[in-house]
């Protein structure tokens, strides 16, 4: 599925009666039928349709003009929602020995109005390339898909200048992560987490995370040497490297990150 194919907004009508709604269509190549238009959302007449290709071009421009060195990391697209992630390759921050994090920046968009056009910064654990998405502890700027966001390009470029001055934010989050390294976790603690802080997680997702955690850290658990940092990384392992990622994967990543970082005050 090509996230950068052509898109258009087509007025809807019924038996000659025009509607105020519009269909958003994206062009996709079918192996048998060739190029065809597929509907990916219904929006209002004032909906500002922003092509993913423009969002990526904007991201690449910001990366080029930044004082830091960036490279593409990950692209998500499900036909309607889009996210483009980049990782800083020039600066790192230590959490524990041989365990560093780096700054990331992300750009989100949607063709059906379900996700705001947005710029955000996040963090990357280098040893496993896990992305750690947060709304509460890093930068986030959203733009509505309407006329109030016309000229969004300049607004995002100005907002994204913060990437060159994120050192204090990164260090503040790093301090909380170092507290995770120092916070022991028992199986009883996991039960408490499940019934309180992470009680919102779907049963299937909790099962995947807890199974992965228990298998990955089995020897450390037997030695009572497992930490909140170990558990948190089991969460981001599952969510960031999901073979069939969804927008929910990114949203759960954000909520878990904010909940666990928030507990490390």
Where is each model-derived feature located?
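A broad "ordered helical/assembly scaffold" signature
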Residues: 42-43, 78, 160-162
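Intrinsically disordered, low-complexity regions enriched in serine/threonine
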Residues: 1-18, 74, 89-265
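Beta-rich nucleic-acid/ligand-interaction surfaces
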Residues: 70-91
